[in-house]
């Protein structure tokens, strides 16, 4: 049967009242300089390609920080989900808060205008949400707004225009009803994969921002479930776990052993225009490879793996598993340049003039599942690599130790997901 892959990402940010500092309501304009325009261009000049370098830079900066603080742990997140959510939030930020958000996301505002950023995301989300054969990607946002508060029309219109956000008004004093409203929407949009995302809310919350990515794709070259058998996976020198290992031995794949770096790289394609890179460091060299893991290095590997001499027949051993990642963004992002957003210095007056808002809590959850049965699966794997050519001239790749994974949209040049699989038996 075909291997079906699901990747689901949720990011939730909560904006709550700061203590005191209430403003009298009056009509006003958002601080954003964006202007409404439908952007449908494609090719090298498309708006989404203008923001791709900054998005990639943010992805790897976020990864470095997480990896340095959680050595020996699985990592999995969607940089695109985080970037889109906070770029959308910047529509309601003013003065220093707006520039801190956009610069924290990696955008050089002397080279790229704010309008370019938002039109870039508009084009990116539109492109990813287009239907495709064998590939379904759904990227969406929702704003849950207090029914007692008057929000600026420009902020609401811009979030819908550029980020395809859906708006819901709710009574946050009815915490049970609001939690159910949020969770029901998330459950519906993720096809039931994410349930009970929000477990509690404080009564002083005025707005909840939700961003999600749902990804479902078929491998170009699927596995056969009857060939899956239990095998060892070597977490480290002292830890070995058993995992169901899939097998494929009649197909050609794109892979290389880097002559300058201690790692091997495998590229596997989904139907559609999405690709996944699996990067396997040599034994004990994970830290060395993480240090050179940059957007430029990813492009170098991608360019090399276009050459025919790297297309070879493989005996491929590939584990099936489930992992997830949960991150408290209000603790992480201040170290990436978002210095004021989660403090009383935050200026979110482009959202409403009625109350002073501050971002209180923000978290991100990502899940990745892999199996070959054609039910629910996802894109992540780990492997070790060996070469045997003396008798059969066949290369053997055994995915049996920690590796890195990058899931990449070719048409938008965007890193959709980034992670590290250290122990595939850990959720």
Swiss-Prot record:
Subcellular localization, as worded in the UniProt entry: Secreted
GO molecular function ontology, one term from the record: serine-type endopeptidase inhibitor activity
Pfam families the UniProt entry points to: Serpin
Keywords linked to the UniProt accession: Glycoprotein, Protease inhibitor, Secreted, Serine protease inhibitor, Signal
SUPFAM superfamilies: Serpins (SSF56574)
Keyword Ligase: no
UniProt GO cellular component terms: extracellular space
Domain of life assignment: Eukaryota
Keyword set includes Membrane: no
Record: glycosylation sites: 33, 108, 157, 238
Positions bearing the site annotation: Reactive bond: 388-389
Signal sequence region: 1-20
Self-association state and partner proteins as the record states: Monomer and some homodimers.
Family from the record: Belongs to the serpin family.
Record function comment: Inhibits human amidolytic and kininogenase activities of tissue kallikrein.
Protein's recorded name: Kallistatin
């Amino acid at each position: 049967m075909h291997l079906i892959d699901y990747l689901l990402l949720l990011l939730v940010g909560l904006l709550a009242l700061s203590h005191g500092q209430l403003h009298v309501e009056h009509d006003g304009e958002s601080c954003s300089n964006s202007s409404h325009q439908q952007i449908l261009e494609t090719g090298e000049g498309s708006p989404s390609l203008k923001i791709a370098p900054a998005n990639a830079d943010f992805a790897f900066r976020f990864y470095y920080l997480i990896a340095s603080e959680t050595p020996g742990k699985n990592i999995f997140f969607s940089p695109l989900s985080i970037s889109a959510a906070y770029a959308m939030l910047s529509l309601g930020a003013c003065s220093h808060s707006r520039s801190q958000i956009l610069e924290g996301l990696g955008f050089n505002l002397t080279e790229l205008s704010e309008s370019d950023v938002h039109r870039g995301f508009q084009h990116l989300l539109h492109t990813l949400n287009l239907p495709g054969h064998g590939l379904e990607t759904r990227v969406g946002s929702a704003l849950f707004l207090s029914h007692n508060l008057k929000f600026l029309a420009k902020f609401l219109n811009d979030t819908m225009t550029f980020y395809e956000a859906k708006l819901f008004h709710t009574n946050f004093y009815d915490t049970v009803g609001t939690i159910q409203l949020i969770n029901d929407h998330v459950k519906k949009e993720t096809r039931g994969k994410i349930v009970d995302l929000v477990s509690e809310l404080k009564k002083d919350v005025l707005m909840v921002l939700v961003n999600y990515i749902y990804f479902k794709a078929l491998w170009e070259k699927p596995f056969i479930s009857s060939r899956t058998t239990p095998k060892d996976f070597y977490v480290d020198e002292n830890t070995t776990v058993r995992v169901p290992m899939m097998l494929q031995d009649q197909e050609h794949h794109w892979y290389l052993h880097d002559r300058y770096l201690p790692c091997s790289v495998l590229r596997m394609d989904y139907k559609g225009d999405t690709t996944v890179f699996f990067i396997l460091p040599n034994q004990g060299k994970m830290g060395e490879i993480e240090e050179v893991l940059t957007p430029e290095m990813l492009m170098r590997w991608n360019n090399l793996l276009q050459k025919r001499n790297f297309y070879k027949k493989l005996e491929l051993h590939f584990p099936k598993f489930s992992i997830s990642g949960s991150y408290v963004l209000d603790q992480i992002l201040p170290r990436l340049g978002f210095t004021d957003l989660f403090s009383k210095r935050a200026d979110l007056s482009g959202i409403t003039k009625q109350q002073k808002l501050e971002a209180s809590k923000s978290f991100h959850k990502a899940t990745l599942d892999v199996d070959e049965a054609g039910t629910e699966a996802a894109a992540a794997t780990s492997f070790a690599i060996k070469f045997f050519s003396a008798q059969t001239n066949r290369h053997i790749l055994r995915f049996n130790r920690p590796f890195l994974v990058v899931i990449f949209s070719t048409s938008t040049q965007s890193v959709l997901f980034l992670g590290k699989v250290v122990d595939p038996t850990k959720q």
